[in-house]
Amino acid sequence: MNRMLGYLKGYERESVLAPLFKMLEATFDLFVPLVMADIVNVGITAHDLHYILVRCGLLLLLAFIGLTCSLTAQYFSAKAAVGYSTALRHALFAHIQSLSFSEMDTLGTSTLITRMTSDVNQVQSGLNLFLRLFLRSPFVVLGAMVMAFTVNARAAMIFVVTIPLLSVVVFGVMVVTRPLYKTVQTRLDRVLGLTRENLTGVRVVRAFDKEQSEIDRFEDANALLTGMQLHVGHLSALMNPLTYVLINLAIVALLYVGSIEINVGGMASGDVIALVNYMNQILVELVKLANLIVQISKALACAGRVQAVLDTKPGMTFPAELLGEVAADKTGDAVRFDHVGLTYAGAGAPSLTDISFTAKKGQTIGVIGGTGSGKSSLVNLIPRFYDATEGSVEIFGRPVASYPRDALRGRVAMVMQKAQLFGGTIRSNLLWGNKDATDADLWAALETAQAADFVRAKPLGLDEPVEQGGRNLSGGQKQRLTIARALVGKPDILILDDSASALDYATDAALRKALAALPGALTVFIVSQRAASLQHADQILVLDDGHLVGIGTHRALRSSCPVYEEIYESQFKKGEAEA
């Protein structure tokens, strides 16, 4: 938690001034019952209207000063809380960006979204309340007791007994409920995860007529959340009635003692009113304190969850400078896998086993295999989205781990299976590949990606708006734009991870022809389910259950690799295959 407090840096002044101004407000509030007692004891008893008006003016002055102090404290506490949450959110987002795919897979997208939004907001609200009330409420409680002694020491002993009892109730409820709020947040994560999963896959749910099944899953998770929230709510709800009972008993005792003191001349009636007002002030502040404790319990639980993400160490480190030298016998290599294995965190079986091959500069490498054979896992190792658990992966004669992050990403461009575009324009999305690219560079990339025609047909061309996720574009258009985005950076290695699946055969063929015609020694990896898309590749890697079962040209594999032959024949008629 000490690290969490570090995000208050720059707001130390506000963090001190906010509670101080609340204490000033409380100080003026503590004088109000004494002024009211004077009005009753002196003004009303003596029928002195002038005295009453003067004291009423004093009450208005105290109220005005208290309001000014309160507004000032609100301003400083809000500024500190918002500044803190902004710094925390920035730090959390930056830390998430530093995590590898492995940590992202472990934590989960919905969990990280919850940490960034709901949890940080809860911490902000808790801090805001804390700065305003953590000194004011105890100060008023203790101050009211001290002021009660200035009125009547015997009656004030009731405060001495009542306040510890109230403290036991308040802090007892806090101790019991705080760990339960952590459970509530965990179950809330589960509900949010199910919601996100369902909304993301809503078309699949409806296609398989699983609406009722999903409703049942959600209701089960929601019932667990509701049950825990009710349990915590019932425990927290005990606080108010218990405190009210104790306060009311204390007021009854005050009235009893006060009546006796008045009869013997030890107190005036105004003094009893002052003592009751002090007791009511204690009640109000303890209710505030109780609510503060509930909010702080939630905020601490959320802060702990945010801290857990911040404590997650990135599984990968990148050097600041390029390391090592290229061996003379590897100068022509673009990518080299040497007995590579990969096992994902938490997975029971390896996804890749003993993979070895070399891709030369300028070659086109096809990757094919059945579903779950490890195709994406293999190409994900090249840009170092994951680290191999066995063996070594090299690009251009050096281990991928020897490249700084920006240098590696500059040389290797990858187009993912799912075409992901961001809200903005076509131009802004393409500039992700190279922020300094000219319009000529953008159009050249679009021509190669077979996207220039449909972009020219748009009313605004490169400045045509793109909705979040590319919702206003077809699947094929999105895929071609993501390919163009990768080409804008002019990489040395281009990886197309089944990223032309939405293209027709003619467009797919034109794309491959355009890639082959690019100047320079661009090495291309094409992951595809279509054997036809890989026929002209210099090498084709055939994967089966994480093993490399075949490597060679299309013609060689048809005669030497049963898995490849089976895939090919399943996509073409027997006569066409033989032709």
PLM regions with names:
Residues 1-31, 36, 44-60, 65, ...:
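Membrane-integrated ABC transporters
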Residues 10, 14-27, 38, 68, ...:
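Transmembrane helices of ABC transporter permease
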Residues 10-13, 98-102, 118-131, 135, ...:
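An intracellular "coupling" helix at the cytosolic face of ABC transporter transmembrane type-1 domains
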Residues 46-47, 82, 90-114, 118-120, ...:
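Short intracellular "coupling" helices and adjacent cytoplasmic loop segments at the cytosolic face
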Residues 48-50, 54, 147-161, 231-305, ...:
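Helix-loop-helix
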Residues 327-579:
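ABC-type nucleotide-binding domain
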